[in-house]
Amino acid sequence: MKIRTLSGSVLEPPSAVRATPGTSMLKLEPGGSTIPKIPFIRPSFPGPAELAEDFVQIAQANWYTNFGPNERRFARALRDYLGPHLHVATLANGTLALLAALHVSFGAGTRDRYLLMPSFTFVGVAQAALWTGYRPWFIDIDANTWQPCVHSACAVIERFRDRIAGILLANVFGVGNPQISVWEELAAEWELPIVLDSAAGFGSTYADGERLGGRGACEIFSFHATKPFAVGEGGALVSRDPRLVEHAYKFQNFGLVQTRESIQLGMNGKLSEISAAIGLRQLVGLDRRLASRRKVLECYRTGMADAGVRFQDNANVASLCFASACCTSADHKAAVLGSLRRHAIEARDYYNPPQHRHPYFVTNAELVESTDLAVTADICSRIVSLPVHDHMAPDDVARVVAAVQEAEVRGE
């Protein structure tokens, strides 16, 4: 897609050498050789010269925030990318996008009702519910997809419908839920609003080929520096309903309208001009970068086919912040992580702990309810998260594959 700068020139695909952090080294043994570490996340941003050009234009316009020309163009560009039937509100970060989504979809709560959500997601999801006046009700996940389990939700709704204000559905790891239509039917049957947290999923598609962004009452994205589509700090709320997006814009500006009078509860959630400018540059060539990330997953799947790990369903059409895989057992997971460390490869095990096991929610257990979370506990005990980068070097991919294979062979 073509993106223009404030001066009207067309942005070219970012230079081959993008801004990346320095490389650290690991010494394998005393007196031995060193090898470069493979980082878990490698942010990929426009270079200093490109950022300087954007900042000069912003300084010349003397418009740094408050819905400036870059923000307006960025919102339109996001809509062009996601689909013309959608409407977009940009926000300062993904958390504020989620707060706005909950507020405009469910209204202000008084902490006497609950939002159904998986425990197997980032802890900011439950915190957002509390900030907007709702309590988390944790449901289990599906053993095959690791996405929120419809049957777990039904069991709660059928018994406690009057205590449930809505559904906060996570597209886990930014991967589109293959049962999204079933979830929407469930929400309609019980007259419950449904909001989708697709934080890491900008550029992902559902199994039917539709890009994330247009399901439920709304979906939100995070453009944090760790995401495949990143501006540093930023986010967006996307909906088919223009009125909901209009409310989101008011929410992020203290509820103010053109008369400078506040007509609804709000806060400051506006995206800065420099973040919007970065976003415009990041959109150029995005699909090529995402394709390169999916190629990494394909290599992992092929190379680890006999290593005893299973990758997430539908991840092959996701934007892939990282590659999640389940090991055969907790011991196998420990062996895989140990082998990765020895090979100077950074890895994680998201989402372990799940939300309900974070100390805040353990200490304040009266704030939450929970179904049986047996599958969540099992997946957390076996999951590993492997690095994925834009245009990841083949040698790095091969090193990750070899490390996982070695853990299986050695059976540590």
UniProtKB/Swiss-Prot annotation:
Family per similarity comment: Belongs to the DegT/DnrJ/EryC1 family.
PANTHER family on file: PROTEIN RV3402C, TRANSAMINASE
Keyword set includes Oxidoreductase: no
Coiled coil: none
Protein known as: Protein Mb3436c
GO molecular function: pyridoxal phosphate binding; transaminase activity
Keywords linked to the UniProt accession: Pyridoxal phosphate
Residues bearing PTM N6-(pyridoxal phosphate)lysine: K227
Cited InterPro entries: DegT/StrS_aminotransferase, PyrdxlP-dep_Trfase, PyrdxlP-dep_Trfase_major
